[in-house]
Amino acid sequence: MGGGNAQKSAMARAKNLEKAKAAGKGSQLEANKKAMSIQCKVCMQTFICTTSEVKCREHAEAKHPKADVVACFPHLKK
């Protein structure tokens, strides 16, 4: 005889829990630290890798008005 719906649900839940434990090793905080790959060369503040050029320019103009944007973020030079 086959199992009932409750038994199937419990088995699926247990299986998914094991998958989540295996896939979720490590901390989200560690992943966030690794994603901080853009760094201002003047003040060494880090930015997430998806930060736009506009945000980098805003930072340079607000925090380092005397320094050139390229001095802060060398990857922005064309």
From Swiss-Prot:
InterPro entries: At2g23090-like (IPR039713), At2g23090-like_Znf (IPR039438), SERF-like_N (IPR007513), ZNF706/At2g23090_sf (IPR026939)
Protein name: Uncharacterized protein At2g23090
PANTHER family listed in its UniProt record: GENOME ASSEMBLY, CHROMOSOME: A03, OS07G0114300 PROTEIN
Residue ranges, annotated region (Disordered): 1-28
